[in-house]
């Protein structure tokens, strides 16, 4: 079975996964639980566990993505991001949801608990991105300060930029289709997130209102090897760096908790 077909077939099981607290260590989000999307073995993004700042600037910062391992310890932040703790601390706080399409024009405000308990479910593969609500970005840093102050961002900055956080939680099979912006990092706290990346000069073939899941089903299988993106699955505790203006799309293989650090 082709890689994309295998991912989609295994995703289908996610739609019948039962709610629950999950095994110890999953924070109650059930990553890797029954029906989670299988992790595709193909990875064309380099992983580095011993990267120095000089190497980062010379080899990656302006050139290509890289996956960073072991540079920070966010175990405290991870513990605070368990399902029960987030609901206890922020359940009644209003959060702003965006549509999971390229431009994300439409916004919806509702209590965080309502999002987690009623909207956080596996992606319907027939839904359009502009019909799918997604909690990512638009964070209220005043109301959520007690959480964000415990996060340790990647230590490598870029001259003339300042970091800005964007925190999110999304269901299995969800994601954002191809788009680009400035450089940044994305760390998975719980779950797994698959990334697809193209350099600025190589515009991918995609529809801005179709989901990444639809792109994986309809477009990815027909791509010749020379037209395939860089891709890899980022697991809990790993950080992906993407350079300025690189096209990227994401697919959450589990219900995933994640945080990005944009360098603006």
From Swiss-Prot:
Glycosylation sites per record: 130, 140, 209
GO BP field: positive regulation of canonical NF-kappaB signal transduction; positive regulation of sprouting angiogenesis; regulation of glycolytic process; regulation of pyruvate kinase activity
Residue intervals of the JmjC domain: 131-264
Keywords: Cytoplasm, Endoplasmic reticulum, Glycoprotein, Signal
Gene Ontology CC terms: cytoplasm; endoplasmic reticulum; endoplasmic reticulum lumen; nucleus
Record carries keyword Glycoprotein: yes
Chief location of this protein within or outside the cell: endoplasmic reticulum
One Pfam family linked to the record: Cupin_8
Modifications the protein undergoes after translation, according to the UniProt entry: N-glycosylated.
Range of residues in the leader sequence: 1-23
Subcellular location: Endoplasmic reticulum lumen; Cytoplasm
GO molecular function per UniProt: cis-regulatory region sequence-specific DNA binding
InterPro entries linked to this entry: Cupin_8 (IPR041667), JmjC_dom (IPR003347), JMJD6_ArgDemeth/LysHydrox (IPR050910)
Source taxon at top rank: Eukaryota
Function: Functions as a positive regulator of TNF-induced NF-kappa-B signaling. Regulates angiogenesis and cellular metabolism through interaction with PKM.
Quaternary structure, from the entry: Oligomer. Dimer. Interacts with PKM; regulates angiogenesis and metabolism.
Protein name: JmjC domain-containing protein 8
Taxonomy of the source species: Eukaryota, Metazoa, Chordata, Craniata, Vertebrata
């Amino acid at each position: 079975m082709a890689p994309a077909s295998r991912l989609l077939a295994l995703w289908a099981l996610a739609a019948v996964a039962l709610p629950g607290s999950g095994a110890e260590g999953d924070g109650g989000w059930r990553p890797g639980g029954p029906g989670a999307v299988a992790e595709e073995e193909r990875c064309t993004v380099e992983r580095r566990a011993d990267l120095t700042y000089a190497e980062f600037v010379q080899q990656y910062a302006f050139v290509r993505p890289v996956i960073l391992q072991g540079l920070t310890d966010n175990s405290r932040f991870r513990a605070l991001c368990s399902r029960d703790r987030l609901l206890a601390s922020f359940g009644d706080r209003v959060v702003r949801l965006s549509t999971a399409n390229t431009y994300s024009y439409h916004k919806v405000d509702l209590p965080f608990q309502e999002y987690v308990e009623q909207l956080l479910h596996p992606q319907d593969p027939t839904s359009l991105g502009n019909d799918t609500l997604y909690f990512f970005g638009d964070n209220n840093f005043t109301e959520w300060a007690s959480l964000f102050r415990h996060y340790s961002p990647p230590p490598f900055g870029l001259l003339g930029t300042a970091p800005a956080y964007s925190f999110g939680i999304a269901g299995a099979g969800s994601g954002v289709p191809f788009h680009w912006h400035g450089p940044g990092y994305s760390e998975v706290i719980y779950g797994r997130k698959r990334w697809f990346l193209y350099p600025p000069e190589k515009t991918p073939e995609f529809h801005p209102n179709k989901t990444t899941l639809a792109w994986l089903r309809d477009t990815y299988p027909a791509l010749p090897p020379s037209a395939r993106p860089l891709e890899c699955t980022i697991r809990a505790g790993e950080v992906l760096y993407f350079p300025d203006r690189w096209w990227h799309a994401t697919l959450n293989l589990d219900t995933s908790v994640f945080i990005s650090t944009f360098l603006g």
